[in-house]
């Protein structure tokens, strides 16, 4: 309030300096604004109900962020006389209305009222957000409505425009669903590849048997006897009775179908359950990986076609009534030769083969059925080609990769980056912990390798030193032997020709005792040289 007064005061003091205060309601739109926390909780789907702080009856004035921008633009263009303006849309929504709307359209569909004080424990909510969410104020922007020319984005308010607001939110934050369908013959690696892609993209891995089991379990829960509380309204009881009757009728039809088809469920029920699964909120938010279904052209057509024949989507210049809400964005066609697939199944451990369709008879029958279905012009891949969703063909047999790492890498390259919020705080902490452990293990391995290398080098150095010393001693010994061998003739010569005359000369020198013994000895040797004689 003090800031608003100061701004208005500056405008009154200086005529050339016009100032305005625009009192805006809670802003929504684009990335979600102050309602982003509720959008995120709903989109992630990790809680059974969105929280409503307090009783939720407080009225919150709101305005779309683009409409607020339009109001400000009009203030700049027209410089109106009032310097204090109210900018809100025409809605009168409570906190409960807003949260319930978010939960219904992109979340679990339920809300839970919690104490008002718990709002302060929500770490993603700032004090400014809480002030806007907990306010109870009715406002009407009469001047803006009567005097400004605004192209309203959400004039009627948040609830009435939730579809466009949700679209903005998902596009702004890059949260568009990733929808993938993986098809191929048995044992080609569909499930293992789908499982890895589901982990990487944080998608829902959809397998036919799980969908059927989940749907039947849900129907059985509906028809199971319940204790009805005294406070139930009559209308709610009637609706519940109708749901029970419909569920029981559907269960009876399923039972009859399985009895008539040797335990196999008729396509009409499979398509119904699969379509309900693909239209569920988690699949609409994050996306899905459809594993091995549909198998035929007719199944694909029944699953992905629009239920209302009048609603048709134009696809690149042609009309085709497929349901854009559930149609896959990427279709992966895995394949391999029959010999490769048979060899892969033969090499599977017995514990994996037991109780599955990988037993020899069942596998060969399933492989033969797949080949028979996919030799005609109307295959499941032809359906996707017709709506210009061209499959990504991968020959697993040529990759020579038992773990399918190369196929997964190729698919990730085709599909692109994940479209989600990324890692949660817990996942980041886990990733950091794993990275730290890997770093420590790597450093320890490098240190051990370095020590081992140093020890090996030292051992080699000592061995080389010992070898060198050994060879040096050998060389010295050989040199001594050579010198000794070479000195024998010289010694013989000395003993024969030199030493007798030298001894006589020394004896004579001792007898005579000349003044210069050396000259005397030299003269004696010269005179008495045997060779000279």
Curated annotation (Swiss-Prot):
Its main location: cytoplasm. The keyword Kinase applies. Residues 177-426 are annotated as: Adenylate kinase. It is found in: Cytoplasm, Cytosol; Cell projection, Cilium, Flagellum. ATP binds at residues 187-192, 397. Residues 489-533 are annotated as: DPY-30. In the central section; belongs to the adenylate kinase family. In the C-terminal section; belongs to the dpy-30 family. Nucleoside monophosphate (NMP) kinase that catalyzes the reversible transfer of the terminal phosphate group between nucleoside triphosphates and monophosphates. Has highest activity toward AMP, and weaker activity toward dAMP, CMP and dCMP. Also displays broad nucleoside diphosphate kinase activity. Involved in maintaining ciliary structure and function. Residues 207-265 are annotated as: NMP. AMP binds at residues 242-265, 292-295, 299, 365. Residues 419-487 form a coiled coil. The lineage of its organism: Eukaryota, Metazoa, Chordata, Craniata, Vertebrata. This is Adenylate kinase 7. GO terms for molecular function: (d)CMP kinase activity; adenylate kinase activity; ATP binding; nucleoside diphosphate kinase activity. GO terms for cellular component: cytosol; motile cilium. One of its GO terms (biological process) is cell projection organization. It catalyses: AMP + ATP = 2 ADP; a 2'-deoxyribonucleoside 5'-diphosphate + ATP = a 2'-deoxyribonucleoside 5'-triphosphate + ADP; a ribonucleoside 5'-diphosphate + ATP = a ribonucleoside 5'-triphosphate + ADP.
